[in-house]
From Swiss-Prot:
The keyword Phosphoprotein applies. Residues 1092-1103 have a biased composition (Basic and acidic residues). Residues 400-438, 808-828, 874-924, 950-1103 are annotated as: Disordered. This is Kinesin-like protein KIF1C. Residues 893-910 have a biased composition (Low complexity).
Length: 1103
């Protein structure tokens, strides 16, 4: 049986009174083992279907052939688990579902015939099978324990001396256990029934005194079933120990649907913590089974419930789960969540083994091997006499086994496992040198307790059980709870004649569980030395008294007399004077103690007299809810007005705290060192989370949404433009913690804060699928930012659940999104993929923008260079005309009216008359002047040609002119376009001169390209010379050109520097090398405006 999956069954109950009053519709249907649910808000969508091991339809009556009764549920699940318990396996059955879904009814049931739940039927069947299997070699023993887990505290329900919370510990051999939890020996089903009844009474009394609700606590009823077998051949005793755990989980409900607030909301948070941890454990185990993630970390110790159920979930146990469903459409979200929970659970596989002694296991395996070999020999035709001889030898060997067998090897304690990052202490002697004396003493005492408990005989256990039973009866008698004539405590029965009080509780399982007799004469109620002892905040030492006075006609009249200052209500009205009670009256003492007065004899006499019932009691059942509603109505308390007043107070408080947060954020924005948007948003996120979380502790998510929408979120007052492009995430600093030591829990909390902030900024328009996608995206982003692994695969699910619990989801949008998506986790995965694709698209766009920044810069450089080059031919034409005319034209001063009038003519090139066909040199010269693209290409070619000739010439031939004609152009290896700028020191010498010495040596043109003397030619560009100041330069450019500035015409174009970037004018050095200088040059108006144009005229030494 090892390696079997968890058995999962779902059961749907009938409508309750609340659902019937609201005209609820059934949205759950079952066909065989398939359960389907329809979204009431998206009725056109296909229903979601789930398949389980069992689907029980209990929505109708017993006349329906499809109706599943309590007996059928036990036959399918209970009998199978009980069979595993007899085989020696651990067994666990737990019920899960929302409050009021029928978990307690399925597990415990009622006292009426045919209404018993799984637990009573299993206990009764256990003892019936034990009585049927009695033999001399077999003996059985049964021990039970009953505990309650409320707000992460463990309470023993069978030990009246246990007052506080018990500690949960983990032994490396025994596993998790509750320290000092009583285990009582029982010998019959009646003993178990009495103990269960006592446990329920203790649970009811404690819940009433502390104003608790049993539906908010987990109940665990454990049966330890031991089978001892004596082997006559070996003379050894073997034991098989089975642990049967029957768990009734607390209700999984939403705070907004239950109206919880204050302490109830805190209880719900603890319930959600335990149930959420249970969901995490189930998800982690399911992922391990599906081979999605192999992780050794299972968060068992995150809650007491999962810690105690560690062996039952994925461990050494046979486990079954019953999911209780509500069929109403108003509970659609809770029902769908329960179905998904159950669907996840069925993927878990448990590795159960038989719990028996090692020697017994060895002997059993050897006996099975002998039987198998004997059958093999018989099949091969071995004679019967030979088999008899083998039997004789086998018997002699078995007889010698006790003498030669070694003692059982001690079970070596396994190494302690690591949970939540801390090492669980072990009992191995290697660690005793590392612990302190106090811890060593505590471990020693605990080990001695365990040894004493294991060595305790059965008779001692029975005596201990009897002593505890007497103590419980004495305690109940002291409290005024009725006791049977045979000494057993009261179950659910009503006396025939005696007037009495029966308790009412919010949980139906705890209603009518306590019965208080009203004796003849005076019965006092209070806290100390009273006939009926009650405790609580509003119960006085002497609260009230009941007078039972017989009348002459035989009728007994009971009168209630309240004490001064004590709050006592009858049928919702405050009682200040003695009042005669009628059967069926509702009595409220203090705030928490609610009773119904029953007078059987009075009711019988009224029926005999034909007295009509009073008009007061309604047709609905008189339970705790009716008593509370009646109390509020009679006291004139309008629940709606009270809730509105409370909401207004909370809204005013939120508004005040928001204003304080706004002032704080504004101060931080003004005086902080950094005023970036990220820092401001981060501070706003933290303040928003603080206010929303404090508000959520007192109100449901829907009300929180209303208040936040109305009042807004804290802000520093600085408006931020919406970001259109995905920004690469920067590392955030976690509040109060070094990011280097950030854990996965810190990242989850940070993700919850940021997602809640984003959802609140969007006016809570996010649906369930959108929140899941945000959670997955945010967790990946944070893990990548902080260098953490992606963590558990369902980490984003926990984040999404926390966001739902905090801010809820869109009203109707969440259900719609859930209905339109794929079933279960598929829809979330699709949304996750979509969000991931959007994120990758954004990152790709950002990378494109970053990579194209240099291209944009180069394009801007090219555009500006083209605009500058349009000026260069004009300056060259003016220079040619001036030199051909032999005089320097007058240039008006800069800024004068003449300069403004001359500017348009300077910009336009002068018209040239048509000329005869040009030679190749003239054509090249014309293109160099008129075509900037041709000029750039030819200048680049000349530059490469000069460098090549300079390399060929060598160091010895640089004194004279170059005589070799230019050869074929060899393109360089690096053809990247370069822009030498005069303002950059590294580029000033990028085109060095070809000659050596103080004066540059011009190149002589080769003979092949020497122009014909008869052909008129324009003056080619002058060779590279030293810089000369312009007319508008800072060092005075008004000097006239001398006569010695004439130069012989060079035969080759020399490359010139040109600048495409406008640069501010820089002063030239005062000391210049001696030599002839050019006459003053008038800068064109466009160049004067740019102020950074390259020098178009350069001064050079005369050749």
């Amino acid at each position: 049986m090892a390696g079997a999956s968890v058995k999962v069954a779902v059961r749907v109950r009938p409508f309750n009174a609340r659902e019937t009053s609201q005209d609820a519709k059934c949205v759950v249907s079952m066909q065989g083992n398939t359960t389907s649910i329809i979204n009431p808000k998206q009725s056109k969508d296909a229903p979601k279907s789930f398949t389980f091991d069992y689907s029980y339809w209990s929505h109708t009556s017993t006349e329906d052939p499809q109706f599943a009764s309590q007996q059928q549920v036990y036959r399918d699940i209970g009998e199978e688990m009980l069979l595993h318990a007899f085989e020696g396996y651990n067994v666990c059955i737990f019920a899960y579902g929302q409050t009021g879904a029928g978990k307690s009814y399925t597990m415990m049931g009622r006292q009426e015939p045919g209404q018993q739940g799984i637990v009573p039927q299993l206990c009764e069947d256990l003892f019936s099978r034990v009585s049927e299997n009695q033999s001399a070699q077999l003996s059985y023993s049964v021990e039970v324990s009953y505990m309650e887990i409320y707000c992460e505290r463990v309470r023993d329900l069978l030990n009246p001396k246990s007052r506080g919370s018990l500690r949960v510990r983990e032994h490396p051999i025994l596993g998790p256990y509750v320290q000092d939890l009583s285990k009582l020996a029982v010998t019959s089903y009646a003993d178990i029934a009495d103990l269960m009844d006592c446990g329920n009474k203790a649970r009811t009394v404690a819940a009433t005194n502390m104003n608790e609700t049993s539906s908010r606590s987990h109940a665990v009823f454990t049966i330890v079933f031991t089978q001892r077998c004596h082997d006559q051949l070996t003379g050894l005793d073997s034991e098989k120990v089975s642990k049967i755990s029957l768990v009734d989980l607390a209700g999984s409900e939403r705070a907004d649907s239950s109206g919880a607030r204050g302490m109830r909301l805190k209880e719900g948070a603890n319930i959600n913590k335990s149930l959420t941890t249970l969901g995490k454990v189930i998800s982690a185990l399911a992922d391990m089974q599906s081979k999605k993630r192999k992780s050794d970390f299972i968060p068992y110790r995150d809650s007491v419930l999962t810690w105690l159920l560690k062996e039952n979930l994925g461990g050494n146990s046979r486990t079954a789960m019953i999911a209780a469903l509500s069929p109403a459409d108003i509970n659609y979200e809770e029902t769908l969540s329960t179905l998904r929970y159950a669907d996840r659970t069925k993927q878990i596989r448990c590795n159960a083994i038989i719990n028996e002694d090692p020697n017994a296991r060895l002997i059993r395996e050897l006996q099975e091997e002998v039987a198998r070999l004997r059958e093999l020999l018989m099949a091969q035709g071995l004679s019967a006499s030979a088999l008899e001889g083998l039997k004789t030898e086998e018997g002699s060997v078995r007889g010698a086994l006790p003498a030669v067998s070694s003692p059982p090897a001690p079970v070596s304690p396994s190494s302690p496992t690591t949970h939540n990052g801390e090492l669980e202490p072990s009992f191995s002697p290697n660690t005793e040198s590392q612990i302190g004396p106090e811890e060593a003493m505590e471990r020693l005492q605990e080990t001695e307790k365990i040894i004493a408990e294991l060595n305790e005989t059965w008779e001692e256990k029975l005596r201990k059980t009897e002593a505890l039973r007497m103590e419980r009866e004495a305690l109940l008698a002291e409290m005024g709870v009725a006791v049977r004539e045979d000494g057993g405590t009261v179950g659910v029965f009503s006396p025939k004649k005696t007037p009495h009080l029966v308790n009412l509780n919010e949980d139906p399982l705890m209603s009518e569980c306590l019965l208080y007799h009203i004796k003849d004469g005076v019965t006092r109620v209070g806290q100390v030395d009273m006939d009926i002892k009650l405790t609580g905040q509003f119960i006085r030492e002497q609260h009230c008294l009941f007078r039972s006075i017989p009348q002459p006609d035989g009728e007994v009249v009971v009168t209630l007399e309240p004490c001064e200052g004590a709050e006592t209500y009858v049928n919702g009205k405050l009682v200040t004077e003695p009042l005669v009670l009628k059967s069926g009256n509702r009595i409220v003492m203090g705030k928490n103690h609610v009773f119904r007065f029953n007078h059987p004899e009075q009711a019988r006499l009224e029926r005999e007299r034909g007295v009509p019932p009073p008009p007061g009691p309604p047709s609905e059942p008189v339970d705790w809810n009716f008593a509370q509603k009646e109390l509020l109505e009679q006291q004139g308390i309008d629940i709606k007005l009270e809730m509105e007043k409370r909401l207004q107070d909370l809204e005013n408080q939120y508004r005040k705290e928001k204003e304080e947060a706004d002032l704080l954020l504004e101060q931080q924005r003004l005086y902080a060192d950094s005023d970036s948007g990220d820092d401001s948003d981060k501070r706003s996120c933290e303040e928003s989370w603080r206010l929303i979380s404090s508000l959520r502790e007192q109100l449901p998510p829907t009300t929180v949404q209303t208040i936040v929408k109305r009042c807004g979120l804290p802000s520093s007052g600085k408006r931020r433009a919406p970001r259109r492009v995905y920004q690469i995430p920067q590392r955030r600093r976690l509040q109060g913690k070094d990011p280097r030591w950030a854990t996965m829990a810190d990242l989850k909390m940070q993700a919850v804060k940021e997602i809640c902030y984003e959802v609140a900024l969007a006016d809570f328009r996010h649906g369930r699928a959108e929140i899941e996608a945000l959670a997955a995206l945010k967790m990946r982003e944070l893990c990548r930012t902080y260098g953490k692994p992606d963590g558990p695969g369902d980490a984003w699910r926990a984040v999404a659940r926390d966001v739902w619990d905090t801010v809820g989801e869109e009203e109707g949008g969440g259900a719609g999104s859930g209905g339109g998506s794929e079933e279960g986790a598929r829809g979330a995965e699709v949304e996750d993929l979509r969000a991931h694709i959007d994120k990758l698209t954004g990152i790709l766009q950002e990378v494109k923008l970053q990579n194209s920044s240099k291209d944009r810069e180069l394009q801007a450089l090219r555009d500006r260079m083209l605009r500058m080059e349009r000026v260069i031919p004009l300056a060259q034409d003016h220079e040619d005309e001036n030199e051909e005319g032999g005089e320097v034209p007058w240039a008006p001063p800069e800024g004068s009216e003449a300069a403004e009038e001359a500017a348009p003519s300077d910009r336009m090139p002068s018209a040239r008359p048509p000329s005869p066909p040009l030679s190749s040199w003239e054509r090249v010269s014309r293109l160099m002047e008129e075509d900037p693209a041709f000029r750039r290409g030819r200048l680049r070619w000349l530059k490469q040609e000069q460098l090549r000739l300079q390399g060929l010439q060598g160091s010895g031939g640089r004194g004279g002119g170059l005589r070799r004609p230019p050869a074929r152009f060899v393109p360089p290896h690096d053809c990247k376009l370069r822009f030498p700028f005069k303002s950059n020191p590294q580029h000033r010498e990028s085109w060095p001169g070809m000659g050596s010495g103080e004066a540059p040596t011009p190149l002589q043109p080769p003979e092949e390209v020497t122009p014909h003397p008869a052909t008129p030619a324009r003056r080619p560009p002058s060779p590279r010379r030293s810089h000369h100041p312009r007319r508008n330069s800072l060092d005075g450019g008004g000097r006239s050109r001398g006569a010695g500035s004439a130069q012989p015409e060079p035969q080759h174009f020399q490359p010139k520097k040109h600048n495409s970037y406008p640069q501010p004018p820089q002063p030239y050095p005062a000391q210049r090398p001696p030599g002839p200088r050019y006459p003053p040059y008038t800068t064109p108006p466009r160049m004067r405006r740019q102020r950074s144009a390259p020098d178009l005229k350069e001064s050079g030494a005369a050749v």
